[in-house]
């Protein structure tokens, strides 16, 4: 009986926690987050359909053309589902160049709302389905950028300063058919000049110093391994010499089938 009560209580507690977790973060995004200032001005004048600038703090700024009155922002969870993309510093630019904040989007009958699966941005009154641009800031992970292709078209991703992707072990870009270039400040731009048809854009990059650290580790491992091999060979040579001095090692012909030495 006690076990049944404990099991029932545990199930109720799990249900309560699960229900609470599922409801966390749903609803309209707060005005403080929507209207916060981005770390740097958005790249409104880009000639790409989507332009992403990755910051050194792993956050990234995105500007993308709108081709629908509603945009769903999400991340794939690896289990066939999605999670809402957490956004801040939301801005919308009308085709005439007027820029409004996220709270102004809401005040003009639009919305920026988070559900359990995605963040929904509905364009404000007077915004055409295409021709405008949506900008927002979100968070990522160190040395890796992955984002679904929310809009069809060309893409450009700017890496943080001093980041590279040339070394195959540490650098990787997907999908292919891209090109890279460096701007006047030395930052690497990854460009898909042709419309991207893949579901996700993914870039793995590294700091320049990572190569030096990797090279140092390889050299250290090589030195330790070489030293260990040398020590092992020396010990074997010493053991062989001692056996010879003690008369244990006696060379015999391969064809000699007689008794061992000392028993003849």
List each model region and its residues.
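Structured, soluble extracytoplasmic/luminal domains of envelope-associated proteins
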Residues: 27, 93-101, 108, 218-225
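Hydrophobic alpha-helical segments
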Residues: 1-28, 185-264
């Amino acid at each position: 009986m006690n076990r049944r009560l404990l099991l029932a209580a545990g199930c109720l507690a799990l249900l309560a926690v699960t229900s609470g977790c599922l409801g966390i973060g749903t609803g309209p995004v707060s005005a403080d987050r929507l209207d916060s200032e981005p770390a740097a001005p958005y790249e409104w004048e880009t000639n790409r359909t989507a332009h992403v600038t990755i910051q050194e703090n792993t956050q990234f700024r995105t500007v993308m053309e709108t081709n629908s009155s509603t945009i769903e922002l999400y991340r794939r969870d690896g289990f066939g589902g999605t999670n809402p993309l957490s956004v801040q510093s939301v801005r919308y630019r009308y085709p005439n160049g007027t820029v409004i904040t996220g709270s102004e989007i809401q005040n003009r009958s639009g919305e920026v709302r988070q559900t359990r699966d995605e963040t929904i941005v509905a364009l404000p009154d007077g915004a055409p389905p295409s021709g405008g641009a949506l900008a927002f800031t979100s968070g990522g992970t160190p040395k890796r950028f992955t984002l679904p292709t929310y809009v069809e078209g060309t893409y450009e991703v700017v890496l943080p300063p001093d980041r590279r992707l040339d070394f195959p072990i540490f650098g990787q870009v997907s999908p292919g058919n891209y090109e890279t270039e460096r701007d006047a400040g030395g930052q690497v731009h990854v460009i898909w000049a042709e419309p991207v048809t893949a579901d996700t854009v993914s870039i793995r990059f590294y700091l320049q110093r990572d190569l030096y650290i990797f090279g140092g580790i390889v050299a250290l491992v090589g030195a330790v391994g070489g030293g260990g091999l040398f020590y092992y060979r020396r010990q074997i040579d010493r053991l062989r010499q001692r056996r010879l001095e003690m008369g244990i090692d006696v060379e015999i012909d391969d064809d000699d089938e007689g008794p061992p030495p000392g028993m003849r």
